[in-house]
UniProtKB/Swiss-Prot annotation:
Keywords: Amino-acid biosynthesis, Cytoplasm, Lyase, Metal-binding, Methionine biosynthesis, Zinc. Signal peptide: none annotated. PANTHER family: METHYLTHIORIBULOSE-1-PHOSPHATE DEHYDRATASE. Its cofactor is Zn(2+). The lineage of its organism: Eukaryota, Fungi, Dikarya, Ascomycota, Pezizomycotina. This is Methylthioribulose-1-phosphate dehydratase.
Length: 232
């Protein structure tokens, strides 16, 4: 085995459960049990120093191994490791958009609640509306915004932009970046009839924010069933 091949393999071998290659596998197995990455959908990526670890495309996320990971150099955007029999994630350009704005982890799910909320918003508020909700305790799990101290409060309004879906995942980047510019305090973007992207400063924050948002989205769907408003 060539020296550079050995170095590439070393990038994904560690006994540390918090190592990105191990952590992505653990997270995706949990996300599968939540129904977020069913049928090979969704993905997760972690930025660790100057390296980006990315789950592959088209694989059963609950069965992934650390050796399935792609590793990219953050500065050059060149792959340092590419598993020969797997495809790079189609989400990669979207993950990069989050990392270029300081994120340490980005999660993409195909949550049913996310999909349903995008349909409800379009029906009730119009094609260009964003998702808005307030006076829900779990909103406290969402940061106020990039560069701001603390999290949103109970009386604050959570806003999550919604972008149109495209035939190919990578083609979402332009509209995703536009939404990031328009809503600079948002840590999530919904994709109509598709799912959601959630990012955070680190893995812990991205995971807990994704959990909080999914909980809020489920509540929002149930509130609509009962005729309850999301905002005053």
């Amino acid at each position: 085995m060539a020296s550079n091949d050995i170095d590439a393999e070393a990038l994904v071998h560690s006994d540390d459960p918090s190592h990105p290659a191990n952590h992505i596998c653990t997270l995706c197995a949990k996300f599968y049990n939540l129904g977020w990455v069913t049928g090979t959908g969704g993905g997760t990526s972690i930025r660790h120093e100057d390296k980006i670890y990315i789950a592959p495309s088209g694989v059963q996320k609950e069965l992934m191994k650390p050796t399935d990971m792609f590793v990219m150099d953050f500065n050059s955007k060149e792959y340092l490791r590419k598993p020969q029999v797997l495809k790079p994630s189609a989400c990669t350009p979207l993950f990069l958009a989050a990392f270029e704005r300081g994120a340490g982890c980005c999660i993409h799910t195909h949550s049913q609640w996310a999909v349903l909320v995008t349909l409800i918003v379009e029906r009730d508020f119009g094609k260009d509306a964003c998702f808005e909700i307030e006076e829900i305790e779990q909103i406290k799990g969402i940061p106020k915004g990039r560069g701001k101290q603390g999290n949103l409060g109970y009386y604050d309004r959570l806003r999550i932009p919604i972008i149109e879906n495209t035939a190919h995942e990578e083609d979402l980047r332009e509209s995703l970046e536009e939404a990031m510019e328009k809503y600079p305090d948002s840590y999530a973007i919904l994709v109509k009839r598709h799912g959601i992207y959630v990012w955070g400063d680190n893995v812990h924050k991205a995971k807990t924010q994704c959990e909080s948002i999914d909980y809020i989205l489920q509540l929002a769907v149930e509130m609509k069933k009962l005729g309850l408003p999301w905002t005053k």
